[in-house]
C-alpha cells in the first residue's frame, strides 16, 4: 500500500464510489499533495502536478481533473488511481488508470474503470468515455474490452484509442 491508505482518511471527501472490493475517491488538493509527496515513480510526478494545478484552476469541475484514489474496501489500502483527463470535450471524457504492481491482474482495474464510467455517464452531457493505451499494454487493452470499450481504429499520442458509448 506504500502508506497511501491514509490519504483518504484526511480527505474530508465529499463523494465516493463503492464497488464490490473498492472505494474510489476523487482527491481534493490536500490528497493530491499527499499523493505527490509519496510518489516514487518519476514518470508520475509531472502528471500528478498537472492534475493538482488543473483541479485548483477549475474548482467547480475539479473531479474531472484530479486523481481518484482506489482503495480496498476491507483494508483501506491504496490500490492505484484513475483520472479523467479534463472536462469532457464533445461529451467524451478520457479516462486513464494505473495500479500498484502487487494489485495488477486481479480485476481491480476493470472494477474501478467500470464504476468510474458509470459515474461519468450520470453527468450532464456525457455520451461516451474514451481511452488510449500503449500499443504493447495488452493488459490495459483487456481491461477496456472487459468494460465494453471498443477500438476506434485511430491512434492517439499514447497508442490505440478506445471508446465506450453510453447505452440509451
Language-model features, listed with the residues they occupy:
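Structural motif
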Residues: 2, 123-124, 147
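Short, small-residue-biased leader/transition segments that mark boundaries at the very start
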Residues: 1-8
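Conserved active-site alpha-helix within GNAT-family acetyltransferase domains
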Residues: 110, 135-152
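GNAT-family acyltransferases
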Residues: 9-94, 99-102, 115-119, 123, ...
Amino acid at each position: 500500500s506504500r502508506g497511501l491508505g491514509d490519504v483518504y482518511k484526511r480527505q474530508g471527501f465529499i463523494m465516493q464510489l463503492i464497488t464490490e472490493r473498492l472505494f474510489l475517491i476523487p482527491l481534493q488538493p490536500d490528497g493530491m499533495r499527499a499523493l505527490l509527496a509519496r510518489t516514487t515513480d518519476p514518470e508520475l510526478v509531472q502528471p500528478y502536478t498537472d492534475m493538482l494545478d488543473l483541479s485548483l484552476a477549475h474548482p467547480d469541475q475539479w473531479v474531472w481533473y484530479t486523481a481518484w484514489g482506489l482503495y480496498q474496501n476491507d483494508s483501506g489500502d491504496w490500490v492505484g488511481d484513475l483520472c479523467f483527463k479534463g472536462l469532457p470535450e464533445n461529451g467524451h471524457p478520457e479516462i486513464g488508470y494505473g495500479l500498484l504492481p502487487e494489485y495488477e491482474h486481479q480485476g481491480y482495474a476493470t472494477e474501478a474503470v467500470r464504476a468510474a464510467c458509470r459515474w461519468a455517464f450520470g453527468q450532464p452531457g456525457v455520451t461516451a468515455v474514451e481511452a488510449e493505451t500503449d500499443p504493447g499494454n495488452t493488459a490495459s487493452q483487456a481491461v477496456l474490452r472487459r468494460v465494453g470499450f471498443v477500438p476506434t481504429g485511430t491512434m492517439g499520442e499514447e497508442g490505440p484509442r478506445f471508446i465506450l458509448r453510453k447505452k440509451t
